[in-house]
Each structure stands twice: as C-alpha cells, then as structure tokens.
Amino acid sequence: MKKIILFLTLLSVGATAQNQSVSFKKNDAEKKIDVLIGGKYFTSYFYPGESVLKKAVLFPILSAKGTTITRGYPIAPRAGERTDHPHHVGMWLNYEDVNGYDYWNNSTAIVKSLQSHKMGTIFHDAVLSTKSNKSTGELVVTATWVDDDGKGQKVLSEKTTYVFSGTSDTRTVDRITTLTAISDLVVFKDVKDGMFAIRLARQLEIPSNKPDVFTDAHGVETKVPVLDNTGVSGDYISSEGIKGEAVWSTRATWMNLTGVMDNHPINVAIFDHPSNVSYPSYWHARGYGLFAVNPLGAKVFSNGKDVRNLTLKKGESVTFRYRTLIADKNMSKSELDLMQSKFAKEVK
C-alpha cells in the first residue's frame, strides 16, 4: 500500500511539473501576438507603433493562475498603482545611451525634465516566425534602432527570439536578442538605465514609508511618492543572498522577487547567462517596481571603480540572453541555482 501511495505522489508531482503546450494568436488590428500556454492567456508581444510606445514589449504578463504581475500604467491603468516613469511598460530591452541617444526614457509622455534629451526609437519590423511543439513556443521578430526620436539614422538592427514555456504553476520566457551595428560605430556608454527589464504590479513592490528621488546620468530627477502600502509585499533576494533594496547595484547570476498576490505566493526571477557581457551582471532592481539587469552600467554601480563602455563597429554584433520565471509558489535557492545551470546549458 505504501508503494502505491508513493507511486501516486510521484505521479502527481510529475504531472504538476509537466510542460504545457504553447500556441500563438495573431491580431493584426491591435498589433499584437497573444501567447497562450495550456490554452490560457499568458502575454502578448505588443507592437502598437511609436505613437503609443517607442519599442515593442511583452504586455501584460500573467502567472499560470491568471494573476497579472506587470503594472498597467500607462497602457491599461489600474487603481492604486504608481504613475511614474511612463516608459516602464511590461517586459522590454533597451538602453539609455547609444551614440548619445536615449532609448530607455523615450515615451509619448516625456516629463518636462527629460525633454532636453536626444531620444531614440525602436521600430518593430517583422515577425519572422512562430512555431510550437508540445512543450515550448518560439517567436522570432526583428526591429531597428533609429536615432533622433525615430526620424534620424538607423543605428542597430535587432533580431529577438522569445521562447515560451509553462507548467500548471509556472511560466518561463527566454529572450535572446542580437544587436548588429548599422552605423560605422555604435557606442553603448556606461550608464545606469538599461538593459532588460520588467515593471511590476504595485503589490510586488517593496513596502516604503518615504518618498524617493532618483537621478539619471544627465542629472535629471524623478520623484516617486509614498503610496498606501496595503497589500504590498515584494522583496528581492539575489543568488548571493543579498535582500531587499540592498540588491541594487550588486552583481548576481540571478535575482528573485517574492511577494503575495491574489492570496498566493508569486515569485518572479530573472537569470543572467554566462555568455552575456559582464557576467555576472549588475542589477538595477528598485523597490518601486522596476526590476532590471544592466550589464553595461558598471561605472555607476561600482562608484567609478569599473567602467564597461561597449563599442561595435559596422557589422559587429552583441547578444543578450535572459530567462524570466514567473511562479505561483515560492522558489528555493537550490531550485533557482538549478534553473540557472539549466539556462546556461540550454541556451548558447
């Protein structure tokens, strides 16, 4: 009898961890591609154009249980959430200083203090392919980075592969982005704001009882006010064991955000890859909901002890690889270490 019970327990665990099918639903009218896992909506590759967003994003992002883990503002605002940094939308990849142009802070609602910046825009070009099997789905897209707020020179060509997977209680996204220089010389200046990021729901912020002021590389300040902390439960922990706000500017192979939404645990973990520039990367993870990894911001994060300007000559490329896990449960350090190891082996 004990053997039967043990067998059934193992069978149950195996079923829970089994990958579900991934499918895609194209919506040309709304300029998005919906991603479904196990028949349930997960996210959309959203490319509405520069009149709405200055880059394509994954938005919104839901957990396996249907909990929305991304902030709604400015696309679909929800009551009680912050309305700072309108360029923080869903999940994205861009950078603050490429040949002197700011791709990170660009939006349709640039605050007055940023209006002197020279902005850049990332244009969605094409969906190259979508394909699925029983356990994963792959979406391949291209884009072009253009300076002078999208009216100037083509600077970089982008090819991004998204790989989606999920189980009954997890969702996983791999983003592999290759940037190739179109200009004769492309310089990613060592600055704070970049590179791969998610803007999280209010409930996943770290509770705070004081206002904050954040300053960018140009000395521009952004004020983040105090809000009601009811239901706010977020906290960070890094692969190195550092917790809370202290993770900002530290280096780690992975970073996990823990919290509670809809009365159950939510974990959102981002994994760096050994082949990435500056591995293990610096983390630009803030308590107010910005969860970012920036391999090129060494000067700011190390107080000037380290500098990581990246230069590409025409035709040269750089690839960034990140895995994101959204779990409707708490993940242990050993589980996250194992996922990090698997990511390193599975993606080259």
Region roles according to the model:
Residues 45-50, 56-60, 167-215, 226:
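Acidic (Asp/Glu-rich), glycine- and aromatic
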Residues 28, 52-110, 217-251:
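Extracellular/lumen-exposed scaffold segments
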Residues 268-348:
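Beta-strand-rich recognition/accessory modules
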Residues 143-149, 162-166, 179-183, 200-204, ...:
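Beta-strand elements of well-folded, non-transmembrane domains
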Residues 18-86, 176, 191, 329-331, ...:
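Beta-strand-rich N-terminal accessory domains
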Residues 1-20:
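Bacterial Sec-dependent N-terminal signal peptides
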Residues 191-277:
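Active-site/ligand-binding surface loops and adjacent short beta/alpha elements
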Residues 85-169:
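Extended, loop-rich substrate-binding clefts of extracytoplasmic carbohydrate-active enzymes
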